[in-house]
C-alpha cells in the first residue's frame, strides 16, 4: 500500500483545541484510521509544520478523501506528499 507524508499546520482554532484537549491528537489518529489511513509515525515539530505524519492508504483517492476531511474541520492546513521507497525509486530509473 502507498505511503504518504502528511505535513500539518495548526490553525488558531487547532492550537486552542490541542491546548484544551491534548488527547485530541490520538482521537484524530483514530478518526483517520476509520477513513482508511494507517498512521505509522507521527511527530510534533517546531518550525514550518506543527506535525509530520507518515501514513499508509489504499490509494491516492483514499488519501485525498482524508485530506479533504481533515482540512474541512478548520483546525489544520495540510500538505500531502506521495512517499516512494528509495529502492523502488532507484529501480524505476
Kindly label every feature range from the protein language model.
Residues 37-39, 75-76:
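A short, amphipathic edge element
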Residues 68-93:
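Glycine-rich beta-strand-turn "strand-cap" elements at beta-sheet edges
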Residues 5-9, 43-66:
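Short, well-ordered beta-strand segments in beta-rich or mixed alpha/beta enzyme
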Residues 34, 59-61, 81, 91:
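Short alpha-helix boundary/capping motifs
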Residues 41-43, 80-81:
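Short beta-strand segments at enzyme active-site cores
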Residues 1-33, 38, 45-49, 86-93:
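Short S/T/G/P-rich N-terminal loop/turn motif that feeds into the first structured element of a domain
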Amino acid at each position: 500500500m502507498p505511503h504518504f507524508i502528511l505535513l500539518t499546520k495548526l490553525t488558531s482554532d487547532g492550537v486552542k483545541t490541542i491546548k484544551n484537549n491534548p488527547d485530541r491528537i490520538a482521537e484524530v489518529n483514530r478518526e483517520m484510521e476509520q477513513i482508511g489511513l494507517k498512521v505509522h509515525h507521527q511527530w510534533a515539530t517546531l518550525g514550518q509544520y506543527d506535525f509530520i505524519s507518515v501514513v499508509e492508504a489504499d490509494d491516492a483517492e483514499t488519501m485525498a478523501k482524508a485530506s479533504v476531511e481533515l482540512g474541512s474541520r478548520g483546525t489544520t492546513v495540510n500538505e500531502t506528499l506521495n512517499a516512494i521507497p528509495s529502492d523502488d525509486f532507484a529501480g524505476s530509473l
